[in-house]
Amino acid sequence: MAQQLSNQRIAWFNGAFMPENQVMIPFRDRSWKYGDGAFDMTRTFEGAPFRLKEHIDRFYRSLRYLQIDPGIGPKEMVAHSEEVVAKNEHLRAAAGDWWVGQRVSRGVDAVGDEGWDHTGPNVVI
């Protein structure tokens, strides 16, 4: 992971935790071009995600309907989501809370052999 400053939010992107401002979605990503993806949001209460498993179950129903395989299972998505919340806890105001979001796109819509490093689904938490 790149150097992290104490005031930067952390995200999980395609298998790695990184500063949120370093998450880069290619401009040819199908979610950007066509809205071809799914998302869900879970609110926290006192820093704890509310009904996260239920949100993730609903999210995976959407992914199955869209026939997008994010490459990780629901249990991993829950664990990574909880870890994102934990890694950002020090930034939460005393009376504040978060929304933790899961976003999955079908991936890059490559034209020809352009050499994209990642052509599978893009997963962001």
PLM feature segments, named:
Residues 1-125:
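Conserved alpha/beta cores of soluble small-molecule-handling proteins
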